[in-house]
Curated annotation (Swiss-Prot):
Family of the protein in this entry: Belongs to the class-I pyridoxal-phosphate-dependent aminotransferase family. LL-diaminopimelate aminotransferase subfamily.
Molecular function via GO: L,L-diaminopimelate aminotransferase activity; pyridoxal phosphate binding
This protein's pathway: Amino-acid biosynthesis; L-lysine biosynthesis via DAP pathway; LL-2,6-diaminopimelate from (S)-tetrahydrodipicolinate (aminotransferase route): step 1/1
Enzyme Commission identifier(s): 2.6.1.83
Modified residues annotated as N6-(pyridoxal phosphate)lysine in this record: 249
Keyword Transferase: yes
Keyword Transferase in annotation: yes
InterPro entries: Aminotransferase_I/II_large, DapL/ALD1, PyrdxlP-dep_Trfase, PyrdxlP-dep_Trfase_major, PyrdxlP-dep_Trfase_small
Record keywords, A-Z: Aminotransferase, Pyridoxal phosphate, Transferase
NCBIfam families: DAPAT_plant (TIGR03542)
Binding residues annotated for substrate, in chain numbering: 15, 42, 109, 132, 187, 292, 388
UniProt protein name: LL-diaminopimelate aminotransferase
Length: 411
């Protein structure tokens, strides 16, 4: 008899964003005339940069000619894209990262889950609370946890609270942890990390033989020159960190799909016999076996991000969304609400008014304002009483949503 992976049965209810979609769909069906503004899931709204579109159109035409047609590409990504990423995103910031340490993929969400394939089942794992749900759920699916308690916390995971009291940056744990998930600029709180903060984590990881999974999906939104964009700006990070990045939010690739994972050649972890094993070799083997690479057409679009025209167009996209974040932050702050994030990040983290729970505020916002956000409790127990609003929408929708919220929830 066939059996299932019973770890899936441990997962709490539905994944956060499908549950949001279910509630919104039910409301929309009952209220077909409602003009719903979605500031929930972090999906972009503005068109792809012209440079990327033109590059992909050219690539499509190449696929129509036998002499320039491309079939299977390298599982790791084409060298011309990896080289541009290495030069522009890392070496330009003083990071010692080479092209062959960069693996192109179809999304950071996939990579942050798939990376667990190359690690053992007996690692201790730390996540912040609140946290991007994928980090937790993929560990549950892989059998790295026990059951969840009433607060949604899984046995076997080490939760590091991030709160207003610690500026939404986790404290270094007292105990030894093997795998550590960090995300800066942070999803969902919009918090950022200083070089000093990341240096403390790198020092901890090196002292304890830990590996940091560093999610830098929102690094393009950093405007403060003093803040690091990459964990590899910190001395010693090549010996303890894997970094994930994406073209989704800076270049609008949410529907086009292109991302990257950096695994330094110098990064190792222990085998069962105590010997050091190069993680680059394991990840390369994993990708070569389970992944056929990103479309040639999409990679040409991603390459165009690094052209002078592409750089200018991406910068304008990022500025547009950051201005949306500023509008959300300033409008809600002026109305008397407690607001965090929205600076150097596209997410605004709002304290729910009137003592409402996160999901109660979600429902009230949907039903009274026809605005969709994301309940903070969906990101973890420490997110209860908070709410995430995304800057990824049109200017008109953001401004209209703020007017609706302020009129119904004045401080």
């Amino acid at each position: 008899m066939a059996t299932i992976n019973s770890n899936y049965l441990k997962l709490k209810a539905g994944y956060l964003f499908p549950e949001i979609a279910r509630r919104v769909q039910a409301f929309a069906a009952a209220n077909p005339d409602a003009n719903i503004i979605r500031l929930g899931i972090g999906d972009v709204t503005e068109p792809l940069p012209l440079a990327c579109r033109e590059a992909m159109i050219k690539a499509v035409e190449e696929m129509g000619d036998r002499s320039s047609f491309k079939g299977y590409g390298p599982e790791q990504g084409y060298a011309w894209l990896r080289e541009k990423i290495a030069v522009h995103d890392f070496q330009a910031r003083g990071c010692e990262i080479s092209a062959d340490e960069i693996f192109i993929s179809d999304g950071s969400k996939c990579d942050t889950g798939n990376i667990l394939d190359i690690f053992g089942d007996n690692n201790s794992i730390a996540v912040t609370d609140p946290v991007y749900p994928v980090y937790v759920d993929t560990n549950v699916m892989a059998g790295h946890t026990g059951e969840a308690n009433d607060r949604g916390e899984y046995e076997g995971l080490i939760y590091l609270p991030i709160t207003a009291e610690n500026n939404f940056t986790a404290q270094i744990p007292a105990e030894k942890v093997d795998l550590i998930y960090l995300c800066f600029p942070n999803n969902p709180t919009g918090a950022t990390a200083t070089k000093e903060h990341l240096t403390a984590w790198v020092n901890y990881a090196r002292a304890n033989g830990s590996i940091i999974f560093f999610d830098a999906a929102y690094e393009a939104f950093i405007t403060d020159a003093s803040l690091p964009h990459s964990i590899y700006e910190i001395e010693g990070a090549r010996q303890c960190a894997i970094e994930f990045r994406s073209f989704s939010k800076n270049a609008g690739f949410t529907g086009t799909r292109c991302a990257l994972t950096v695994v330094p050649q110098s990064l190792t972890a222990k085998a069962a016999d105590g010997s050091d094993v190069q993680l680059w070799k394991l990840w390369n083997r994993r990708q070569s076996t389970k992944f056929n690479g990103v479309s040639y057409i999409v990679q040409r679009g991603a390459e165009a991000v690094y052209s002078p025209e592409g750089q200018a167009q991406v910068e304008e996209l990022v500025k547009f969304y950051l201005q949306n974040a500023t509008i959300i932050r300033e409008k809600l702050t002026a109305a008397g609400l407690e607001v965090h994030g929205g600076v150097n990040a596209p997410y605004v983290w709002v304290k729910t008014p009137q003592g409402l729970s996160s999901w109660d505020f979600f429902d009230k916002l949907l039903h009274t304002c026809n605005v969709v956000g994301t309940p903070g409790s969906g990101f973890g127990a420490a997110g209860e009483g908070y709410f995430r609003l995304s800057a990824f929408n049109s200017r008109a929708n953001v401004e209209a949503a703020m007017e609706r919220i302020i009129s119904k929830f004045p401080g």
